[in-house]
Swiss-Prot record:
Family: Belongs to the universal ribosomal protein uL16 family.
CDD domains: Ribosomal_L16_L10e (cd01433)
Top-level taxon of the source organism: Bacteria
InterPro entries, sorted: Ribosomal_uL16 (IPR047873), Ribosomal_uL16_bact-type (IPR000114), Ribosomal_uL16_CS (IPR020798), Ribosomal_uL16_dom (IPR016180), Ribosomal_uL16_sf (IPR036920)
Any one GO MF annotation of this record: structural constituent of ribosome
Role, per record: Binds 23S rRNA and is also seen to make contacts with the A and possibly P site tRNAs.
Keywords: Ribonucleoprotein, Ribosomal protein, RNA-binding, rRNA-binding, tRNA-binding
Protein known as: Large ribosomal subunit protein uL16
Subunit structure, as described in the record: Part of the 50S ribosomal subunit.
Amino acid sequence: MLQPKRTKFRKQHKGRIHGEAKGGFNLNFGSYALKAIEPERVTARQIEAARRAITRHMKRQGRVWIRIFPDVPVSSKPTEVRMGKGKGSVDYWAARVHPGRIMFEIDGVNDTIAREALRLGAQKLPVLTRIVAREDW
């Protein structure tokens, strides 16, 4: 699964996801892409599940690019632990996804396979998405 090799600090504040994506809203690599249309935090496990679903439907033809990276540490306390005694340990890593952000790009397969693969990948993600093609630009 994806996670940073090194970080400046071990833990971060929760934060909020405000506004549109400031970058990463154009197709740079592939012909078809999965674009987020709402703000959400996507975990490394969800990214990996979507990647597997996409590559499995493409039957290892073509190429997949992951355009988001989980760089936000999410901490949690164990169950049945009282409040206080500091912040919990890092549980998983997540990526903050803004509306308009391209999350996955694929190329090298025909239109129907590409759209179905991205639809299957979108089902694994907690964010509303739209499938976009290079012809739409």
